[in-house]
């Protein structure tokens, strides 16, 4: 990982924006280390990750075993209107993971609590599009994940 951090710094002019070690990112069974790289204006950020020793294979090790090489697992983009963006991407052939069970969407008001007052999106529409909702003390987050984009066949 440090080789790639150095490459992005020296060749691309990126900076190491944040770093996390295996004490900060871990479960009972696996852990990882991550260095988040950022371009000069901060509009592009991405993590460089590597597995840390754990009781089981990490998600990174499973990815490497399956694809037999490093690569891009997923890409995050920002949008001011996730509903329109997802509709446009779907119309252009992008496939997303399936929606969680109905109970996930039924529980959103309870999970979001006070954030429901500022949420403008319709829960039925979020469910229809399989958009996920998370919240913390700073606000709420809408997100969706594509199916794997790599094809090794």
Task: Please provide the spans of the model-predicted regions.
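Glyoxalase I/VOC metalloenzyme domain signal
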Residues: 1-17, 26-153
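Eukaryotic intrinsically disordered and solvent-exposed regulatory patches
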Residues: 22-24
